[in-house]
Every structure is written in structure tokens, then in C-alpha cells.
Amino acid sequence: MNQVQTLTGPHIRTANTTRNIMLHVAISLMPALLGSIYFFGIRSLYITGFSVTVCVLTEYFWQKITKKPVTANDFSAVVTGILLAFNMPVTVPLWVVALSGIFSILVVKQMFGGIGCNFVNPALMGRLFTMVVWPGAVMQYVAPRTLTTTGFDAVSSATVLGTVKNGGEAGYSYLQMFLGETPGALGETSKLLLLVGFAYMCFMGIVNAEAALTYIATVIILTFIFGPAGLFTGDILLNLFGGGLILGACYMLTDYAFASRRGRLLYAVTAGIITAAIRIFSFYPEGICFGILTANCLGGALSLLYK
């Protein structure tokens, strides 16, 4: 019987070791981390460091207790910890970060066999876990520091997509959305810095950009066609830069190891359709988490159809 294996995104097409690959992914996330410190203050670094520590220690102690080979030094838990923090607002309590990290590593990753065996993205599942259990802790955002201000605004506010979804004005230019001068989670606001990191991964040859681009294209095309004021009235740049689409596409989209290009693209399109449908038809402004996780769950069936 053929074996179907999954890897936590980004999808790797190289003979490098897991440790080297994950090290490069972690390095690629550093521009966005530095950006989060600039936009939201030093607490961004504390949250990220704490999240990484919890994830690494959870993996280490679980593998020690279960007498499995210790892989806590392969940087995969580090990447999960960074991405988990990137999905949190700067105001999130540290105990929420801790419980989310334990859930991501222990339940989602290790109980399914560890890296390469978990069928959904651990960081995204950790995000979903906190959204369901403590929504108030992870869905309250603050306005960041900008080029014309000296610090972030501690008053809670909605994301740009959330504001527009509720009938308000975006309040930010497309350039501000691209640079990161908008309310949002720590690592999702600066599309520029995320793309710098993604370009680094592409340059190093450790990521397949085709699935990410297909996912992005699917979302922006569908949200443009089925716009809020009728057909072909959607705001392409708002949907591209106003939320977590870039972070989701570049770092969260788990790409199954399809042998065929068709299967890989269908997987990305599936995630894009679900994400767009949630943005268009539900009361949730984002849809990234639900879209990618649903596609993760369907990935096994798709991989059997398109080997």
C-alpha cells in the first residue's frame, strides 16, 4: 500500500535535513518578528520567546516521558512556537499562549506521531483552539505604532477586514496595510516583511511557491467576483493586504507531498475556495484558519486521487 505523508508547511522540495530546513524557516520569520517589535513593542518578543519555549519544552518532556527519540532540537517546535505567537495579539495573556502551545505540540503534533505525521498545521490548530475557548483573549487587537506615532494604541480595535465587514470604513491606506501599520496579530500585519522572509525561503530552495500563489489568487479572485455590492465589486487589495492572507499562504498552508502538480494546485484551490466563502458569506472577516485547516483534513483524500 502506498504511504501518504504530510509535512507542516511550508512544503519542502529538498534533500536538506529537517533541522536545516526548519532553521531556514525560522530565519525567514525574523524580519516579521522584528517588525512586530517595532509595531507593537517589546512585548511581542516576550510573547514569541515564551511561545517558543513552551513548544520546545512540551515536545522535549513528552518524548522523554514516552521514551521516544528526542527531536526538540530540530527547530520544528521553534517554528511552531513562532507561528503560534504570530497569530496572537500583543495583548494576549501568557497563560493563553502556554495552553495553546501545549495543545499545538502535545495534541496536534505528538499524539499523531510527530513531524511528518500530523495532518493539520499545529500552529493553526492552536489558534483555533484559543478562538473557541478564549475568543476574547485572541480577537481583540490594538492599533500599532506608525511612522507618525511613537507607540501603539492600547485601545482595542478590530482588524481592517473586521471593520469593513461590519460596514465601517477601512481607515487605513493600502500602503499602510502592506507595511503593517494596521491592527492585527503580531506577525500578520506587515506583508512586506513576510514577503521578504518568503523570498528568502524561495531563494534557498526550501519552499514550493506555486501552492501559496495559487491559494492567494483563488481568494482574491473569488472575493472580487462576489463583492459586497454585487458581482465584481470586491476590493482586491483590501482582501490581499487587509488580513492574514499572506501569512497563511506563505507559512501556514500545509502542502501535501503530491507527486502531481495537479493535486498540489487542487489542494491550494480548495483552501482558497473555503477561505473566500467564509470571507464572503459568514460573519467571520478572515477565514484563513478555517480554510487551511479544512483543506488539511481533505488533503489525504486528494493525495490518494492525485498521486
Q: Where are the predicted features?
A:
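Cytosolic-side transmembrane-helix boundaries in multi-pass membrane proteins
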Residues: 1-21, 282-307
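Hydrophobic alpha-helical segments embedded in the membrane of multi-pass proteins
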Residues: 27-29, 53, 75-83, 98, ...
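Long hydrophobic alpha-helical segments that form multi-pass transmembrane helix bundles
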Residues: 116-195
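Loop-to-transmembrane alpha-helix initiation sites
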Residues: 119, 123, 236-245, 264-267, ...
